[in-house]
């Protein structure tokens, strides 16, 4: 059985501007499996949205090829409609409908849809269920757009800047919903220019700059590969790996370290003179699967982006 759900091979999209042509997406190649959360990270104009649109069959490629669930997404629209769902940054919704009516209509298009009430509850929209779309706030509208994308139970969920402009509390709730989709077995592919979002959600990240892929890998590996050395910070889930086990298995007595309890887990900062040795020890341990947000020398994906592109990426 083919384990690849999405396969892009030298995917290219060319536009013309002021009489000159340029590649908005330039020979991009990657593969994605059938489940998990993956991200395209880069600034505006990097080619993220155009790449997503070609994967979803909304825009044809000029060169190269893309296969999604074994078919050409631009040719086989029936497969894409049934098995892939996309939440664009902006969408034309019926302004006179309530949230409940809109999601009910959306659910009626698909035979195995989730109950609109369940989606409304998961997105924390119960208080707005009878509110007309025209009267929704920006944060509420963003969640409704995500609701229209997840209600059909898609095999592939494409999200374009899903938390752009949201306040931290609403953003964190939306991240929980996205995480849940990945854990249900959905392949989630999102675009973002938020370092925090990429580190928090994505198993693997593709960094794009000027239409090209300049780096890819897990946030952890990208940080380790592109930071020369320094003290190590990380967050660990105490429910999956206890602080006492961490102390006995990883944090040797001669190491200086600090522990801070955060909403996302235990934040550990370790002062070490041998970064490589400590990281190898940490990532070879049973704790590795519970570790998130590794920083080296107090830097993270922002440093990686500067290293591979030579430019700053402004985070939300």
Annotate each predicted stretch with a short phrase:
Residues 85, 107, 111, 224-228, ...:
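A generic structural signal for secondary-structure junctions
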Residues 176-271:
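ABC transporter nucleotide-binding domain
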